[in-house]
Structure formats: C-alpha cells, structure tokens
C-alpha cells in the first residue's frame, strides 16, 4: 500500500465475500497498485461461548436475531486501531435500509477522507446502543432489503474508490457521468455509425464541440426531468430555475 492511500475496513461475518468484484477491473488493479487498501475484520471471533455467538433475541420479542452491542463494539474497536477519531476524516458506516440514501456526493466526501469503516449487518440488525455510542452513520443503498450488508458494501466502496486520483485512467469521465452535476448522464454511442437502421445522432459526428456539449447538456436535462423528477427539482432549485419550465428538452 502506498503511503497515505485510502483505506476500507469491513466488519463482517463473511470476510470471504471480499474483495469480490472489488478485486476486478480498475478497482482491482488500483488495489494491486496500492492506491487503496481493503481489510476485513471477522465479527465471529469476537463472539461469546464455544460457538462464538454474536447475536441474541430482540428485546420486546419478535422474529429474527439482533447483533449484540458488546460484540459489535469489540469489532469496531479492533477496526479503529490507527484511525483518526474525527468522523469527517474516517467515517464509520452501518449499511441499513433505514439509513440516509447513498449518493454521489457522499461518495465524494468519503473519497476525500483518509478511509472508511463499514459495518455489515445480518439478521434483524444491530443493537441501537452501539450505533449511538460509536456515532455510526446509517446509510442505505436503496429502498429494498438484502440478506446482509456485504453486497451493499462492495457497491459503496466501488463508487468511492473510483473517485480516488489515478484509479480511473481518465479523470474527466467522472465529471461527465450521472450525478456529477446533479443530472443523469447523457446517452452514449459508438461505432458502427448505423446499426439496425438506427443511426448515431448527427451532431455527435459533426466535430463541433460546442454543439456536442449543448446536445449532451440538453439530453442530460431531458432524461433527468423524465426519469428522476426529484433530482430535476433539486437541480433547478440550485440554479433558480422553474422545474416545470419548457426548454424543449
């Protein structure tokens, strides 16, 4: 690992799930180059008893099991060794469907930190007391439920790592893609010029960079307005525009 490289630490019952897809393609190459590092902290050894139990029945009754606060705390303590205490420099995140929605802005903030600790839940969740005591931020990948946080953790790390300098060969690509300016990305095309009687828009073949930029901006606005009205309203509000205006998108 290169000095000062971004670090990801994962507290999980399934350390064998990593690096998973993070070990492939550009993120995998960057991992090999030492541009970032990945460490898993197995929750099981911190468990109690002969079977290293990590969970117990939910207080008040109900289905499923809950990860115990004392056991999760020991794992978080192990994960925090050598990390700064300020959460802005090193966020500690619990992946939860009730958390704050993950966003590109969040990924940018994390990429600018020194590293990140992710707690992958299982069963019915984690005892709330440890989340409160350790100032753990709850983050959601979307409005759906997974059997555990490992898949979500890989997605969040991928979105963050690709923003680290030198991970992507072309930094400009991160500036043009979806959400970089609050808009969805414009449509992309490549050769052949004609495929099944469908042609690449003429403006993209014109070589006129200003016209291409205008077309891409208009398409990005059109798609955002059609598919993500929430993003469109926020985009317009930030620019003093009426979201219902008609600009021939």
UniProtKB/Swiss-Prot annotation:
It comes from the Bacteria. Pfam families: tRNA_m1G_MT (PF01746). Its EC number is 2.1.1.228. GO terms for molecular function: tRNA (guanine(37)-N1)-methyltransferase activity. One of its GO terms (biological process) is tRNA N1-guanine methylation. It is found in: Cytoplasm. S-adenosyl-L-methionine binds at residues 121, 141-146. One of its GO terms (cellular component) is cytosol. InterPro entries: Alpha/beta_knot_MTases, tRNA_m1G_MeTrfase_C_sf, tRNA_m1G_MeTrfase_TrmD, tRNA_m1G_MTases_N, tRNA_MeTrfase_TRMD/TRM10. The keyword Transferase applies. Homodimer. Specifically methylates guanosine-37 in various tRNAs. HAMAP family: TrmD. This is tRNA (guanine-N(1)-)-methyltransferase. The gene is trmD.
């Amino acid at each position: 690992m290169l000095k000062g490289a971004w670090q990801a630490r994962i507290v999980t019952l399934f350390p064998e799930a990593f690096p998973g897809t993070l070990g492939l393609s550009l993120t995998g190459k960057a991992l090999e180059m030492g541009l970032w590092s990945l460490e898993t902290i197995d929750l099981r050894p911190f468990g109690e008893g002969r079977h290293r139990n990590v969970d117990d029945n939910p207080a008040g009754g109900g289905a499923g099991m809950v990860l115990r606060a004392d056991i999760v705390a020991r794992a978080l303590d192990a994960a925090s060794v050598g990390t700064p205490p300020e959460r802005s420099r090193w966020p500690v995140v619990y992946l939860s469907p009730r958390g704050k929605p993950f966003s590109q802005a969040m990924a940018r903030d994390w990429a600018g930190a020194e590293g990140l600790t992710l707690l992958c839940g299982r069963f019915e969740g984690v005892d709330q007391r440890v989340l409160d005591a350790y100032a753990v931020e709850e983050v959601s990948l979307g409005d759906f439920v997974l059997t555990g946080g490992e898949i979500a953790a890989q997605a969040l790390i991928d979105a963050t790592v690709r923003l680290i300098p030198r991970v992507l060969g072309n930094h400009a690509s991160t500036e043009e893609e979806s959400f970089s300016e609050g808009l969805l990305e414009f449509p992309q095309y490549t050769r052949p010029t004609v495929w099944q009687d469908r042609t690449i828009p003429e403006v993209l073949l014109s070589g006129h960079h200003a016209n291409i930029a205008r077309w891409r901006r208009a398409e990005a606005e059109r798609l955002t307005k059609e598919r993500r009205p929430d993003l469109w309203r926020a985009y317009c509000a930030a620019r003093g525009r009426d979201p219902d205006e008609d600009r021939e998108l």
